[in-house]
Amino acid sequence: MKILILGAGKMGSFFCDLLSFDHEVAIYDPDPKRLRFTFNAHRFASLDEVDAFSPRLVINAATVKYTIEAFTNVMTHLPADAILSDIASVKTGLPEYYAACGHPYVSTHPMFGPTFASLSNLRNENAIIISEGDDLGKAFFRDIYQRLELNIVEYTFAAHDETIAYSLSIPFAATLAFAGVMKHQAAPGTTFKRHEQIARGLMSEDDYLVSEILFNPNTPGQLGRIVESLNELRTIVRNRDSAAMSAYLARVRENIR
């Protein structure tokens, strides 16, 4: 299959490496310097080169801020039956775009962002496939993710956003709360160092990505749960209530089983 990848960042390069030995792959990035380390693939410096390539599948790996713009820019260079696909962690605007674009589409969310996951060993990672997509496109990505030994779940666009509010917004907010009051320690403990490492990883992410994940309409409710839990903990600590602390810790242990 002829596959065009938009964006030569970490995830675009990952999919290029993954697919280029089984498919004819081309990769485009508006910054040609980012194409220097791609191999076994056509490297396009201009979208005009896409016309002759005539891809059957387009994988949009542009940063989340430019996902829809990247589709819009390439649209006139694609055959009418080309399948559009995105791997964005934030799906805002995509259901409406796909409904109006006239192309078959598939939307997935590989939940192994390059900041924390080892892209050479993804056995314990997860991927979401959006159920509204094209059957052929869904089958293609399901096969890829199965070969990577990922745990695969299928959600609607709406259920995806609810899940992301829980699985990303809560840890993002908790990490920001920690980093917001963090001070440099000359001799930090193990727990502090681990939290600091996570905070540094999160802060290396694109500001727009972090913002859009936190701006998920479902996030305020999840933040409210964090605030309630912290208020409860603060009351327990302030009152030095050993029985309440034991009950609180027992509940937390039950949550992480």
What name fits each language-model region?
Residues D22-A26, A80, L150-N151:
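A generic structural motif
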Residues K2, R56-L57, I83:
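Structural motif
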Residues L78-L94:
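ADP-ribose/adenylate-binding Rossmann-like module
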Residues E154-R257:
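An accessory alpha-helical subdomain
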